[in-house]
Amino acid sequence: MELNQVKEQLLKLQSRLSAYAHAMESISYDGQTVAPKGTAENRAHALAVLSEEEYLIKTGSETVALLELLDNNKAVLTEEEKRMVHLMLKDIRRMQSIPMDEYIAYQELVVKAEDVWEDAKKNNDFASFAPYLSEIFETNIKFAKYCAPDKAPYDYWLGEYEDGLTMEVCDEFFAKLRERIVPLIKHISASEQVDSSFLKGNFPVAKQEELSYYLMKLMGLDLAHCGLSTSEHPFTTSLGSHLDERITTHYMEDDFASSMYSVIHESGHALYDTGVDDKYLYTLLDAGVSMGIHESQSRFYENLLGRSKEFVAFVLPKLKELFPSLKDVTAEALYRAINRVEPSFIRTEADEVTYCLHVLVRYELEKKLMAGEIKVTELPEHWNKLYKEYLGVDVPNDKLGVLQDSHWAGGAIGYFPSYALGSAYGAQLLSKMAAEIDVKDALSKGDFSKINDWNREHIWKHGSLYRSDELLEKALGEKFSADDYIDYLEKKFKEIYK
């Protein structure tokens, strides 16, 4: 077979696998949104069958031979083809390390765990979820040892979400954040507090939904390729390619800001996914490169833009139109209220200053669980202890504590540090962007076009072509540093809390 034919086979293989991904992601999305409660067993069965097919395709001798032939002829491959081969071989070697029956059983476990978690959260019943979560952590430890026996299991999974990330890197990063953020929190606590009482009230879900679509359109999302639904925990997913994007939110009638910022956050993810260059359609490059870069985009739009003085002032007339109780609220009052700093229980509703401490709690617990230092049954106790130590709050129940996030139920062990890293990436990207375009002026006009064009050119269009560190360095012209993020927090919040 000629090399051009081999390259064509590579594209066909990726296209076929993207169709399997579409089917499996659709089943998962359905389960977290509109699927009836009694369908978990059926969905688990379907995912098990599809997972077996996917496993056999990826680990089959024909696929392995194809990839090894291409890998041995790297000199004649394009940059894109080399990256496709690298990513596929990495995935295949991971799968080859895990016995097929265990891989399939894990896919079934996650479907059931997500279903049980949703009920457990609603009923404040951690005990019913604990056996599933124990099995998820045990399986992740086992799989990590299969795939990288010379690595600590947690280091392996951290690196799967963010290339090169380790506990050592995380420890250094979080230590730097705490060094400057803890004094900032003390400064804020000693200052006059901000009134945010008007953010609570009666905000009909229908009006909040109208606001959601307004925000998605305002941010530049193509609604022909991006849908909105509701779920217990907001999330974003691509169904097989960047042509089919789904985001979800969770409405609370007494709090419009919760869903408003969830929608802005998830829309940031969706802009990244749908912004990948069309030439990568149905290939492994048709996705964001890492969860850290993904969170840099979601938290960039949610906080750096969405909580800015300029954006808040622009969107206020729309809020007053939808919610009459806000008719006397000024732009300055709303800006201060939206940025109120107050230690709380819920990560997704945390302010920008204390947010990284929520992530740190999860990181510390994952580290201990993956090292076998604590048991899942002890998790609520350790969770509540760290929340008291880091945020000074007494967690009243598990629904507002250890059960609040869906990530562990979905098997996403090692994901959480990406949120804090993404926030820091985003601040550095904003510094670079603001040196080239007038971001504040654009936001004051509600015009995201130049902002999106910059992100598309520097981040989105590249998909998974580059490693995350390479992508950042190309976009920034320098290596990553957390300094811009901490400087941003200090400047912004010392102006609000004088």
Residue ranges and their predicted role:
Residues 1-163, 490-498:
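A well-structured
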Residues 10, 148, 265, 298, ...:
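Divalent metal-coordination and catalytic microenvironments
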Residues 106-258:
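Contiguous, non-catalytic segments that form substrate-binding/exosite surfaces or channel walls
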Residues 174, 178, 205-209, 215, ...:
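All-alpha helical catalytic cores of prenyl diphosphate-utilizing isoprenoid enzymes
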Residues 42, 102-105, 132, 173, ...:
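Secondary-structure capping and boundary motifs in well-ordered enzyme cores
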Residues 287-328:
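Post-HExxH zinc-binding segment in Zn-dependent metallohydrolases
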Residues 148, 258-277, 295-299:
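Active-site recognition of the HExxH zinc-binding catalytic motif
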Residues 2-6, 25, 38, 42, ...:
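C-terminal, non-catalytic "cap/extension" segments appended to globular domains
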